[in-house]
Amino acid sequence: MDSMKDKIRQALVELDIQATEEQIEQWLEYLKLLEKWNKVYNMTAIKKIDDMLVKHLFDSLAVAKYIKGSSTVDVGTGGGLPGVVLAILYPQHQFTLVDSVGKKIMFLKNVKKSLGLDNINPLNIRIENLNGSFDNIISRAFSSVDTFYELCKHFLTKDNQMLAMKGPDLEEQNLVSLPLDIEKHSIKVPFLNAERNLIVMRKK
């Protein structure tokens, strides 16, 4: 466990993120819960906690600096990625975690209780049926960017942003058709030798 903590500390240095020992403990506790529930409920294709550390925790932390304001909706959150990871980092920021799969929301309610995360609100709802206003609308491995936009455009204002976490495929053909200002950021994930990108979309 200490070696995992050391790896987290090293990743935080690489990402230029300040975090307390308590937050590091919370991230590890979250991953342990995810690993445990995964054995029964198939929450994620990644089975081993060592792999989750890099492909889930560090991947989520790598976009932390792009989160603005005080509220975020995590669309198709699954096991709480990136929402739970970022909620631990930003305790003053409110995260609404949305998924249409009931067992995943059941897991997230367990995470909320176990870790005492008062700033997450897990909702078993389809995103197109959710109302509200958010500074960030984020998704990780949820859908194509054009589908993401179609399902979430009712949230978009001139003051907020949509963030799509992506692998190497930037979906240029889909981005061209969107009536949005688009920024593409190459994301370096500690200990991960794979191309990761963040697409930030704002109203023109």
From Swiss-Prot:
Location within or outside the cell: Cytoplasm
Main location: cytoplasm
Keyword Cytoplasm on entry: yes
GO cellular component, one term: cytosol
Entry EC no(s): 2.1.1.170
Positions of S-adenosyl-L-methionine binding: G76, L81, I127, E128, R140
Keywords (A to Z) from UniProt: Cytoplasm, Methyltransferase, rRNA processing, S-adenosyl-L-methionine, Transferase
Highest taxon above the source species: Bacteria
Keyword Glycoprotein carried by entry: no
GO molecular function: rRNA (guanine-N7-)-methyltransferase activity
SUPFAM superfamilies named among the record's database cross-references: S-adenosyl-L-methionine-dependent methyltransferases
Catalysed reaction, written as an equation: guanosine(527) in 16S rRNA + S-adenosyl-L-methionine = N(7)-methylguanosine(527) in 16S rRNA + S-adenosyl-L-homocysteine
HAMAP family, A to Z: 16SrRNA_methyltr_G
Family: Belongs to the methyltransferase superfamily. RNA methyltransferase RsmG family.
Entry function: Specifically methylates the N7 position of guanine in position 527 of 16S rRNA.
Listed name of the protein: Ribosomal RNA small subunit methyltransferase G
The organism's taxonomic lineage, starting at the top: Bacteria, Pseudomonadati, Pseudomonadota, Gammaproteobacteria, Thiotrichales
